[in-house]
Amino acid sequence: AYAHSSCGSNYGMQNFSPGYSHFPIHQETEVSSGFPQSVYSGNIASSVVQHQQHQSYIEGSAHYIHHSYGPEQNLSVANYNNNVASLHISQREVCHSPSSETSPGPTQTFDWMKVKRNPPKTGKAGEYGYAGQPNTARTNFTTKQLTELEKEFHFNKYLTRARRVEIAAALQLNETQVKIWFQNRRMKQKKREKEGLLPISPSTSTGSDEKSEELSEKSNSSPCAPSPASSTSDHLSASG
């Protein structure tokens, strides 16, 4: 019991509890609760002061920037709005102005609006073929050619093919040009007679000359062929 009490009192109470356990724990708590708290609180205080100074500097600079750049910015925005409003007003005046509606100005003619026409070509010998071919331009006759054609029309209202070839060679024309001119001249003659400007001639009242002209053209153009009556008679004589 003595040994146990002495061991417990000497070792446990004096050495362990008061010497090792009690004092170092309080010292550690004091150190941990005193110095770090004071340092941390000091840091907080200094940071708060710095933050307040920085915030006041920012507010002052922002206040300075607002006063220095605010009126100019507002002025530029106002000028932009005024320019846009004046532009819209000018466009409306141009589109809905009464002067442009009542008295339009001279319109400009562009190249794509112009109509292109081919100039008339002068007829030459051998340039145009027979009648019925496409893209046949109107022939511009000379004064000499018209005079000779009028002379021939005065004597002969209808031409044979041989006479037409002769006149075309003499006037440097082709047969089709001479034929068309005579057809148009006969139509013009009939129109004047119907209107009462010219007396009715016996040659133009009948179409026998025109039919004879067509028959002469067909006989000259087609080759000679035996008649069907002669061919049948020859066939019967050969068989008999």
Swiss-Prot record:
Subcellular location field: Nucleus
Listed Basic and acidic residues bias regions: 208-217
Motif Antp-type hexapeptide location, chain numbering: 109-114
Biological process according to GO: regulation of transcription by RNA polymerase II
Annotated stretches, region: Disordered: 186-240
Transmembrane stretches, start-end: none
DNA-binding region: 134-193
Entries under PROSITE patterns matching the protein: HOMEOBOX_1 (PS00027), HOMEOBOX_2 (PS50071)
Major localization listed first in the record, in broad terms: nucleus
A Pfam family: Homeodomain
GO cellular component, one term: nucleus
Top-level taxon of the source organism: Eukaryota
Keyword entries, A-Z: Developmental protein, DNA-binding, Homeobox, Nucleus, Transcription, Transcription regulation
A molecular function GO annotation: DNA-binding transcription factor activity, RNA polymerase II-specific
Residue ranges with Low complexity bias: 218-233
Biological function: Sequence-specific transcription factor. Part of a developmental regulatory system that provides cells with specific positional identities on the anterior-posterior axis. Acts on the anterior body structures. Seems to act in the maintenance and/or generation of hindbrain segments.
PANTHER family: HOMEOBOX PROTEIN HOX-A1, HOMEOBOX PROTEIN ROUGH-RELATED
Family, as annotated: Belongs to the Antp homeobox family. Labial subfamily.
Protein name per Swiss-Prot or TrEMBL: Homeobox protein Hox-A1
The organism of origin for this protein: Xenopus laevis
